[in-house]
Amino acid sequence: MAAGVAAWLPFARAAAIGWMPVANCPMPLAPADKSKRQDELIVLNVSGRRFQTWRTTLERYPDTLLGSTEKEFFFNEDTKEYFFDRDPEVFRCVLNFYRTGKLHYPRYECISAYDDELAFYGILPEIIGDCCYEEYKDRKRENAERLMDDNDSENNQESMPSLSFRQTMWRAFENPHTSTLALVFYYVTGFFIAVSVITNVVETVPCGTVPGSKELPCGERYSVAFFCLDTACVMIFTVEYLLRLFAAPSRYRFIRSVMSIIDVVAIMPYYIGLVMTNNEDVSGAFVTLRVFRVFRIFKFSRHSQGLRILGYTLKSCASELGFLLFSLTMAIIIFATVMFYAEKGSSASKFTSIPASFWYTIVTMTTLGYGDMVPKTIAGKIFGSICSLSGVLVIALPVPVIVSNFSRIYHQNQRADKRRAQKKARLARIRVAKTGSSNAYLHSKRNGLLNEALELTGTPEEEHMGKTASLIESQHHHLLHCLEKTTGLSYLVDDPLLSVRTSTIKNHEFIDEQMFEQNCMESSMQNYPSTRSPSLSSHAGLTTTCCSRRSKKTTHLPNSNLPATRLRSMQELSTIHIQGSEQPSLTTSRSSLNLKADDGLRPNCKTSQITTAIISIPAPPALTPEGETRPPPASPGPNTNIPSIASNVVKVSVL
């Protein structure tokens, strides 16, 4: 009964406030959907991050990857998951698109990576929501401009070797930092532009009076000096214009360009003044032409990145500037008409016509207020106040857009310059790395270590020999010298670098193993005390200058009784067969292995080169419990195993 009351209580409350009537009988249970199964809750594993959603959620957009059957290719049978090796952060936005139907762009994501993820899942970026679409388009445009700049710089660098003379000259004009000569010409033209502008200003300054005449300007008092300065500047500008015209890729487009027109207007008054006579009728026209010399200041735009950015900003804000001009024109006409009719009844009014009222309207809307024209009537003052407030609103609205565009273009140029500098430094490092291969680097490093060791142990003559001799050959001959000192045998060189043939010596096996060159230096500076341990460093006839640290390694000494295949596998670079007089066999007594260091050969590093190597000796036969050695192996015969023969192989590795 209590359960029934609890079930009806929400409906009773709803009926009390008028939501729904109270039913006469209990509500039936909700029908179970047989088609809805638990396995419709699928798991999407994106780079280790698991996302769960309903299959019907993904099937809302069957044209995409997750909504089609193509996602079955990514199904993992072991984990029963769909695994995608993609960015999990972007996938969160993708999954929200399937859930809500709205695609958003996260501002912290890279635009290229975001586009790649959308392309992988088969989602068009045009369906991005209105709240994020403008941000997406701005980032897309900036990325496209950056890639275009990078491609242009790469194309310019790739086409540099095949540039013609004209192309090289034009590239020097457009980018003066390509060569020293172009940079010098760039600064020379900039200096003469500054001199020309200063001359045009200073020649109008009064420079005293002449007796019997009025005060003269400097241009007339020192006419020769100013003429020489003007001539020098015009000559430089003329040469620059002709060179640019010659090197231009398209001369027609160059002549039509704004900077070309400025160059012509800047130098034309000088040549017109040369051919113009002193006739008073044309002197006024000549003075008017001299005014155009002030346009030479626009030539600074080639030398100032800020001026160029300002030009690009005004060009990119053409629509905003057009809106500003159109709004001002409408407001000027409206308020000029209103002010004319408002001040028409005043006797001392200066608003004589609507065009005359334009001046007052322009000055008022731009918040200048010269005060030469002021309204007299109350209606004129009221409309004048409205005109002033309207001007503030009309002018202030497009200004933030222009400022933001200027900031965007400026920072874009800064980033482009920084990328070019970084790329130039990276290419320089790559060129330096390509000049020397890894073998050359290792060769020089090894020579440095060996020369350092020779400076401590060798004589000047030997150091000179070590520097002039070949590294590998010197190491090889040093190794032969060490073997001769150790075994008392002579060697016949079969190959000057790799292989040597001599007679056999039993129970010796030299194994190749790479060691550092400083091992020899350490061994030459150290005296080994006598010891009772069977160390190789104290054994007479077995110690060499290139194997003094063999006892410090943990590598097990191979046994001469191992199979021949094991012995052959230990050979790496070369095999030395030793031939000579009959040598006494090694004693099998453990006490005979412990000799004093003075009895053996002392380490000898007084050679032209030092070679580091590892010589491993087979372990002597084990002793019997009675202290006697086991009998030696039988002499070779028809039934002798291969290991007894293979034990006479000496293997040497030359570093």
From Swiss-Prot:
Annotated motif Selectivity filter: location in the chain? 367-372
Annotated residues that bind K(+) are located at T367, L368, G369, Y370
Q: Which GO terms describe its cellular component?
A: dendritic spine; neuronal cell body; postsynaptic membrane; sarcolemma; voltage-gated potassium channel complex
Q: List the keywords (alphabetical).
A: Cell membrane, Cell projection, Ion channel, Ion transport, Membrane, Metal-binding, Phosphoprotein, Potassium, Potassium channel, Potassium transport, Transmembrane, Transmembrane helix, Transport, Voltage-gated channel, Zinc
- Topology check: give the Extracellular ranges: 205-223, 278-283, 344-352
Q: Which Pfam families does the record cross-reference, listed alphabetically?
A: BTB_2, DUF3399, Ion_trans, Shal-type
What is the membrane topology listed in the Swiss-Prot or TrEMBL record? Multi-pass membrane protein
Q: Which residues carry this modification: Phosphoserine?
A: S153, S569, S585
The annotated region (Interaction with KCNIP1 and KCNIP2) lies at 6-21, 470-487
Keyword Transmembrane applies:
yes
Q: Where is this protein chiefly located?
A: membrane
The Swiss-Prot or TrEMBL record annotates one GO molecular function as: A-type (transient outward) potassium channel activity
Which residues are Zn(2+)-binding? H104, C110, C131, C132
Topological region Cytoplasmic: 1-182, 247-253, 307-318, 401-655
Please give the residue positions where the record annotates the modification Phosphothreonine.
T459
Which Gene Ontology terms describe the biological processes this protein takes part in? action potential; potassium ion export across plasma membrane; potassium ion transport; protein homooligomerization
> Where is the segment annotated Mediates dendritic targeting?
472-487
In this chain, the stretch annotated as Interaction with KCNIP1 covers: 70-78
CDD domains per record: BTB_POZ_KCND3
Q: Where is this region: Disordered?
A: 618-644
Subunit: Homotetramer. Heterotetramer with KCND2. Associates with the regulatory subunits KCNIP3 and KCNIP4. Interacts with KCNE1, KCNE2, SCN1B and KCNAB1 and DLG1. Component of heteromultimeric potassium channels. Identified in potassium channel complexes containing KCND1, KCND2, KCND3, KCNIP1, KCNIP2, KCNIP3, KCNIP4, DPP6 and DPP10.
What is the documented function of this protein?
Answer: Pore-forming (alpha) subunit of voltage-gated A-type potassium channels that mediates transmembrane potassium transport in excitable membranes, in brain and heart. In cardiomyocytes, may generate the transient outward potassium current I(To). In neurons, may conduct the transient subthreshold somatodendritic A-type potassium current (ISA). Kinetics properties are characterized by fast activation at subthreshold membrane potentials, rapid inactivation, and quick recovery from inactivation. Channel properties are modulated by interactions with regulatory subunits.
Q: Which PANTHER family match?
A: POTASSIUM VOLTAGE-GATED CHANNEL SUBFAMILY D MEMBER 3, VOLTAGE-GATED POTASSIUM CHANNEL
Q: What family does this chain come from, according to its entry?
A: Belongs to the potassium channel family. D (Shal) (TC 1.A.1.2) subfamily. Kv4.3/KCND3 sub-subfamily.
Please quote what the entry notes about the protein's domains. Two N-terminal domains regulate binding to and modulation by KCNIP1.
Protein name as annotated: A-type voltage-gated potassium channel KCND3
* Protein species of origin: Oryctolagus cuniculus (Rabbit)
